[in-house]
């Protein structure tokens, strides 16, 4: 089992952990429907960038 040679200081520990923070998902609002969605994803209604790209109800029924 590996054992450290010298104790790591609080500063070095915290500097290592500085990259561990979680980020919130980036959300967008569709200009047509006003729905909130993930960036580069369509809304649950099937809109993307203000255009209807898929009929969400029929696509769900086909699966």
Swiss-Prot record:
Cellular component terms (Gene Ontology): large ribosomal subunit
Any Pfam family matching the protein: Ribosomal_L32p
InterPro entries, alphabetized: Ribosomal_bL32, Ribosomal_bL32_bact, Ribosomal_zn-bd
Keyword set, alphabetical order: Ribonucleoprotein, Ribosomal protein
MF GO annotations: structural constituent of ribosome
Polar residues bias (residue ranges): 25-35
Basic residues bias: start-end ranges: 7-16
Region (Disordered): 1-45
Biological process according to GO: translation
UniProt cross-references to NCBIfam families, sorted A to Z: rpmF_bact (TIGR01031)
UniProt xrefs under PANTHER family: 50S RIBOSOMAL PROTEIN L32 (PTHR35534), LARGE RIBOSOMAL SUBUNIT PROTEIN BL32 (PTHR35534:SF1)
Family, per entry: Belongs to the bacterial ribosomal protein bL32 family.
Protein name: Large ribosomal subunit protein bL32
Species annotation: Legionella pneumophila subsp. pneumophila (strain Philadelphia 1 / ATCC 33152 / DSM 7513)
Biological classification of the source: Bacteria, Pseudomonadati, Pseudomonadota, Gammaproteobacteria, Legionellales
Chain's gene name: rpmF
């Amino acid at each position: 089992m590996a054992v450290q040679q010298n104790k790591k200081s609080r500063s070095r520990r915290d500097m290592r952990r500085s990259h561990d923070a979680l980020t919130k998902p980036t959300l967008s609002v569709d200009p047509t429907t006003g729905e909130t969605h993930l960036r580069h994803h369509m809304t649950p209604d099937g809109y993307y960038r203000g255009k209807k790209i898929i009929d969400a109800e029929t696509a769900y029924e086909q699966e």
